[in-house]
Amino acid sequence: MEAHISVITLAVTDLEKSLAFYRDGLGLPTKGIIGTEFKGDKTHPSGAVVMFELQHGLILALYPRSELAKDANLSVGVASSTEFSLGHIVKSKQEVDALMKRAQAAGAIVTDEAHERPWGIYSGYFQDVDGHLWEVIWNPNVG
């Protein structure tokens, strides 16, 4: 089996609000909320989801927290921003600063302003409207 990740699904509290953040705030292209024809019930999840096609076939999906829990046969857990971060590499320090400002204007909470890190990168962190942690990175040694 070749190891690769095809879909990253983020559990969200408000699908419309999260859609607006990523589509309107960050500018990610999407068809919007799809799968609304699949109605859920107490034990079966609904199908409403948002998908963003990223590079190399990677999909970023947004799925209501309660529906993701049902789909995986789990209880809804407590959200934590320190479990993982998603990194986005850009081509310059100026792009880091611009994306951090754009995210903040769209409703993100900047948790760590962009600055030089001891290991040679320039990056900053923000939380999206559901608390998911993103790092925007310029690495002079990459691309």
PLM features: what roles do these ranges have?
Residues 1-3, 143:
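Basic/polar N-terminal segments that are highly enriched at the extreme N-terminus
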Residues 5-13, 50-54, 73-143:
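Vicinal oxygen chelate
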Residues 9-60, 66-67:
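Core segments of cupin and vicinal oxygen chelate
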Residues 37-40, 67-74, 112, 143:
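A short, acidic/glycine-rich surface segment
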